[in-house]
């Protein structure tokens, strides 16, 4: 059975969705009650946290604060659909046009989702050429940039430029905003990602296969990309069907997951008197 608990803001929409689901279940000879909507009051969540006899797993979907609250208070196992502080690293041997297209897509195609880019890292040897070409592309969408000292110097004159603080590099903006940092090399980029990443989706743009493999091997994330946008981290895109969430933990599921990850195994052994 599946028990759903939605927010009060979407209560009418949730009820409508449940009605449709239950109608389909009945039409196919299944009991409608296998999918149930709980009242939106907060007290019902507290009861779920301790219902270890009846509930196998909780999957919180929502803000980082909500997910953290569920994880810290639940006695029932939790699959975290964590926040995404996602990075794109433009390495010194990147194709600049390709890097601009990937960066713009990762940031602006849908900025309010967890697989959107939040921080851009650029190799110092390509920073000036790349950022000057990226500037009008992001400016077209009025993207607000929080730049470190080196990037700020290059981007000076960009109308939506701000000086970055350390906190900006760990922010999930969920908006047309991003942090930009110039790094010395791939090692510094990887170290930065290790410090600030939520282990969701991380990308490198480069034509150097050795540097790409180094990045893909060293970065610990549910999805790592070479020359592609972080926006592909999605159940439908990965061929999994309807997505339940994107997990940033390593157990029980990691990355985009669908119904298959919510089933387990049962061993059935038929014998004829065998003993051990």
List the predicted regions and their residue ranges.
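Rossmann-like NAD(P) dinucleotide-binding subdomain of oxidoreductase/dehydrogenase enzymes
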Residues: 1-93, 97
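Conserved C-terminal structural/oligomerization subdomain of aldehyde/semialdehyde dehydrogenase
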Residues: 165-276
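Flexible, glycine/charged-enriched surface loops at secondary-structure junctions
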Residues: 29-35, 111-116, 142-150, 201-205, ...
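Short, small-residue-enriched loops and turns at beta-alpha junctions
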Residues: 9-14, 153-154, 233
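General structural feature for long, well-ordered alpha-helical segments within catalytic domains
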Residues: 13, 17, 40, 44, ...
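ALDH superfamily catalytic-core signature
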Residues: 67-175, 226
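Short, hydrophobic beta-strand segments that form beta-sheet elements in well-ordered domains
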Residues: 38, 58-59, 144-148, 181-184, ...
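Short, structured coil segments at secondary-structure junctions
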Residues: 54, 74, 141, 219-220, ...
């Amino acid at each position: 059975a599946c028990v759903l608990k939605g927010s009060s803001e979407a209560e009418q929409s949730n009820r409508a969705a449940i009605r449709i689901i239950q109608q389909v279940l009945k039409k196919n000879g299944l009991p409608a009650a296998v999918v149930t909507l709980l009242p939106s009051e907060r007290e019902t969540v507290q009861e779920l946290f301790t219902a270890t006899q009846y509930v196998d797993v909780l999957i919180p979907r929502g803000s980082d604060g909500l997910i953290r609250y569920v994880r810290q208070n639940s006695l029932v196992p939790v699959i975290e659909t964590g926040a995404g502080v996602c990075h794109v690293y433009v390495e010194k041997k990147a194709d600049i046009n390709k890097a601009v297209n990937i960066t713009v897509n990762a940031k602006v195609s849908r900025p309010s989702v967890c697989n959107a880019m939040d921080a851009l890292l650029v190799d110092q040897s390509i920073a000036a050429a790349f950022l000057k070409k990226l500037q009008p592309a992001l400016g077209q969408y009025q993207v607000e940039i929080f730049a470190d000292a080196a990037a700020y110097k290059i981007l000076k004159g960009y109308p939506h430029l701000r000086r970055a603080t350390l906190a900006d590099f760990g922010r999930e903006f969920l908006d047309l905003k991003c942090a930009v940092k110039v790094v010395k090399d791939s090692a510094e980029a990887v170290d930065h990602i290790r410090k600030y990443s939520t282990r969701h989706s991380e990308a490198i743009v480069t034509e150097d296969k050795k540097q790409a493999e180094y990045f893909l091997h060293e970065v610990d994330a549910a999805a790592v990309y070479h020359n592609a946008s972080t926006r592909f981290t999605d159940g439908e895109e990965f061929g999994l069907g309807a997505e339940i969430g994107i997990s940033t933990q390593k157990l029980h599921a990691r990355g985009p997951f669908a119904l298959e990850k919510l089933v387990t195994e049962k061993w059935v052994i038929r014998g004829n008197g065998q003993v051990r």
